[in-house]
Regions:
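C-terminal motif of bacterial Sec signal peptides marking the signal peptidase cleavage site
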Residues: 17-22
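Extended ligand-binding regions for polar small-molecule ligands
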Residues: 24, 70-71, 134, 154, ...
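Extracytoplasmic small-molecule ligand-binding "clamshell" domains
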Residues: 31-101
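Bilobed "Venus flytrap"/periplasmic-binding protein-like clamshell domains
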Residues: 39, 46, 57-71, 125-178, ...
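Periplasmic-binding protein-like
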Residues: 43, 123-130, 203-239, 261-276
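Acidic, polar ligand-binding/catalytic clefts
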Residues: 79-142
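Short helix-initiation/N-cap motifs at beta->coil->alpha
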Residues: 79-91, 135-136, 171-181, 185, ...
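A ligand-binding cleft/hinge motif common to bilobed small-molecule-binding domains
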Residues: 104-113, 161-162, 189-220
Length: 276
């Protein structure tokens, strides 16, 4: 009888041990240690976050996210990039589908009610992209008689509709690539979003000479790293990584590599203020 009890106890310990191993083996770890990490980025933004046909990831946000992950203790091979469309970023963070999001994610009060941010790490401005031969749009009010394209979930569309051109015919598409196609085919007259995103598209080889930026600074767009609300430890670590990225010259290197070909004039790295 004692033998049976001992065997049962040993079996119970073994089951508990195996269960703990199964639960913890593949999860993200804030300090790396051989674990994997999933990061949300854009897949359709040249110069910022782009998944190429051969499955590689390029862009400023990709470089920033990779730098942060390495500072958190992860190797490049341990990073999985997950698509983070504008309308899905908060859900991806809250559901734990990603550890953090680096996807042209403008810091604002509405979003901060749902998620926390580290940063900012980049300052962009809202602008307009039009066809190269179109001189009818030179200011925001010209949009009142035009079809304006933006991406669902983006702050740019609300900014234009509420403050700048309330009579604009707003066309919300699922991705920027769709807006670019619509602009080229004259289904829409202009695309609005951050100038960094627009410059990336305009600089693509297949788009060179077809489009131009109007040159309007319609808003300030401070990009931050989105993370789960209340995770102060991760916020502190990411802020430290961002500061180091600027101090060691990596930020300048990433900017030159990703925006240089578009002749896009970036502003200096903004001061990290979130969490302070």
């Amino acid at each position: 009888m004692k033998l049976h009890k001992a065997s049962a106890a040993a079996a119970a310990v073994l089951v508990l041990s195996l269960t703990a191993t199964a639960c913890g083996g593949d999860s993200d770890s804030g300090d790396g240690g051989g674990k994997k990490i999933t990061v949300g980025i854009k897949y359709d933004q040249p110069g910022l976050g782009l998944k190429t046909p051969d499955g590689k990831f390029t862009g400023f946000d990709v470089d920033v996210a990779t730098y942060i992950a390495k500072e958190l203790g992860y190797d490049a091979k341990d990073i999985t990039f997950k698509q983070a469309p504008s309308a899905e970023r908060e859900n991806l963070i809250k559901n734990g589908d990603v550890k953090f999001v680096a996807a042209t994610y403008t810091i604002n009060d509405k979003r901060k009610a749902e998620v926390d941010f580290a940063g900012p790490y980049f300052l962009a401005h809202q602008d307009l992209l039009v066809r190269a031969d179109d001189n009818s749009i030179t200011k925001a009010t010209d949009l009142n008689a035009k079809k304006l394209c933006s991406v669902t979930g983006s702050t740019s569309a609300q900014n234009v509709k509420e403050k700048l051109a309330p009579k604009a015919d707003l066309q919300e598409y699922g991705g920027y690539s769709e807006c670019i196609t619509g602009l080229e085919n004259k289904a829409v007259d202009a695309l609005t979003t951050d100038n960094s995103i627009l410059a990336g598209f305009a600089a693509q080889k297949e788009h060179q000479g077809k489009f131009k930026l109007v040159g309007l600074n319609l808003s300030d767009e401070p990009y931050g790293i989105g993370l789960k609300k209340g995770d102060k430890d991760l916020q502190t670590k990411i802020n430290a990584a961002l500061k180091k990225m600027v101090d060691d010259g990596s930020w300048d290197k990433f900017v030159k590599a990703n925006f240089g070909p578009a002749n896009y004039k970036t502003e200096p790295a903004p001061k990290v203020t979130e969490g302070s």
